[in-house]
Every structure is written in structure tokens, then in C-alpha cells.
């Protein structure tokens, strides 16, 4: 009987740890949920354009990650930092500038507006800066290869 109680409590602990939070409910396996969007870091080195294409090919409605406010910036930085524990690389996000001289020409690849800017210097493609724990943005050459973060909206 004591052995049965131990096993049943063990199963209860396993069940609670797997279902307790429901934190990533609605996201595909391996994706993380934050504020109605799913995110996944890919440790695959691609140019900005190829990373965006890769994200779009994952499923409908996916793009490189958009970061419209500080809370989301912190979430994405933590997601990347957990994946890159020993190595440091810049990481692509979905911000691109069409005209390097005009700030208002920036856009997120998912079409959302740019209301939160954290750019160190200006160029066409933007990534997360490895030297700040991925908490600030850095202008990068679009043809360079870096890992990246994809984002998708939750299905309705």
C-alpha cells in the first residue's frame, strides 16, 4: 500500500508539473507563449531575408519577431539567453528599415507599427545585441548570418 501511495503521488506531481501552468497552451511544441503570440528561437544561421522566409515557411502567420514594447523585449531577451548560455551571437528580429535616413520608414515584418525603438545605430536590418544580453537592438548588415527568433499569432 505504501508503494502504491508513493507512485500515485509521484504521478500527481508529474501531472501537475506538465499541466499546472498551461503557459504555452495553443502554441506548437517547442514554442513559447507571451501576450497572445508564440515565439521560438532558431539556432540556425541565416541572412535576415532568409530568416524571414524560414519563419514564414513554418506555418501561416509567422514572421521574425516583432518587439513593440519593453515587456516583450524582456521576454524575447530571456528566451534567447536561455538558448545561448555559452555562446554569444547577435540574433535577427523582424525590424527592417527601407530608407536608412528616415526613422519613420521602419516596419515590422508582421505589419505592426514601430512604436518602441531601441536601436543603437541605423541600417536596414536590426538584430538583438549580443553585448547587452540581447536587451538592446543593433543595426546589422542584412547579408550577415545570425540565428533568429520567429513569432506567430495564436490561432483564433
Curated annotation (Swiss-Prot):
InterPro entries membership: C-type_lectin-like (IPR001304), C-type_lectin-like/link_sf (IPR016186), CTDL_fold (IPR016187), Snaclec (IPR050976)
GO CC term, one of those recorded: extracellular region
Tissue-wise expression: Expressed by the venom gland.
Molecular function terms, GO-annotated: toxin activity
Keywords recorded for this protein, A-Z: Disulfide bond, Hemostasis impairing toxin, Platelet aggregation inhibiting toxin, Secreted, Signal, Toxin
Record domain C-type lectin: where: 34-151
Record PROSITE patterns: C_TYPE_LECTIN_2 (PS50041)
Pfam families in UniProt: Lectin_C
Cystine crosslinks: 27-38, 55-150, 125-142
Tree of life domain: Eukaryota
SUPFAM superfamilies named in the record: C-type lectin-like
Annotated localization: Secreted
Signal sequence bounds: 1-23
Subunit details: Heterodimer; disulfide-linked.
Family: Belongs to the snaclec family.
Function noted in UniProt: Antagonist of the alpha-2 subunit of the integrin alpha-2/beta-1 (ITGA2/ITGB1) on human platelets and endothelial cells. This protein inhibits collagen-stimulated activation of human platelets in a dose-dependent manner. In addition, it antagonizes the binding of monoclonal antibodies against the alpha-2 subunit of integrin alpha-2/beta-1 to platelets and it coimmunoprecipitates with this integrin.
More info: Negative results: does not block the glycoprotein VI (GP6) and does not inhibit platelet activation induced by ADP-, and thrombin.
Protein name (database record): Snaclec rhinocetin subunit alpha
Naturally occurring in which organism (per UniProt): Bitis rhinoceros
Lineage, top ranks: Eukaryota, Metazoa, Chordata, Craniata, Vertebrata
